[in-house]
Amino acid sequence: MNKWHFHIPRLSDLLPDVSGLSLNDYRYLCTMQFPSTLLENAVNEFAKLPGIGKKTALRMVLHLLKQDIGEVTHFSETIAKMRSDIKFCQRCYNISDADICSICANSMRNQRMICVVENIRDVIAIENTQQFSGTYHVLGGIISPLDGVGPDQLNIEQLVTRIEKEQTEELVFALSPNIQGDTTIYYIQKKIQKLPCKVTTIARGIAFGGELEYADEMTLARSLAKRLPVEQYMSH
């Protein structure tokens, strides 16, 4: 038996973790020299944000260095307070400063109409159109078996209970027009088909496979205004 054992490291063991970095950012990372470890650590943290590369992160950090210490402290405290104190509405699961969000608490909104969306970004997108006067229900995702997301991981049962309890008159689906979105619509429709609730969906002004949050306000407003019965939508 050979008593000599040599460990030959893999190339990946010798390189830094560059997952998620573009080729340009990787090259920049390899050549970037930091005069301060504190500066480098701050840049690395900013670069973890979506859509922020190393160059942009460096510009942000250098901008903060130019600011008064009081402004930087206020900035960091605002972010920390948002993360620690923000809540999710107990009724619709939108983000909120209180147990019930400002939309659900607004008596001027149509409390008998619910717009079902995938995430909070979709709520913001629809609100920016100023064309919807009802309330929302945030599912927290869409059914996607390939991603391990089933109905039990979403706020679907809470939606069914809410429709029954609040005697909802119209349920508007505003989910992204893709296979996962259509699967989610079909599943929920079957769950509530015996309830006296009109079920509609936004018109297909958004290209199939697209995402709701990236639609421009005019297209989204038109899709809301021309919503159609879900049976008609699913038959296309």
Give the positions of each predicted feature.
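Short, positively charged and aromatic/hydrophobic N-terminal segments
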Residues: 23, 28-31
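Cys/His-rich Zn2+-binding cysteine-cluster or related metal-binding knuckle/ribbon modules and their
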Residues: 33-40, 48, 58-123, 236
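Basic, flexible Lys/Arg- and Gly-enriched helix-loop patches that mediate nucleic-acid binding at interfaces
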Residues: 89-92, 103-105, 132-134, 138-161
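Acidic beta-strand-to-loop metal/phosphate-binding motif
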Residues: 113, 117-118, 168-180
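Short Gly/Thr/Asp-enriched flexible loops that form oxyanion-binding sites at enzyme active sites
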Residues: 180-193
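Conserved phosphate-handling catalytic cores of large alpha/beta enzymes
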Residues: 196-200, 211-236
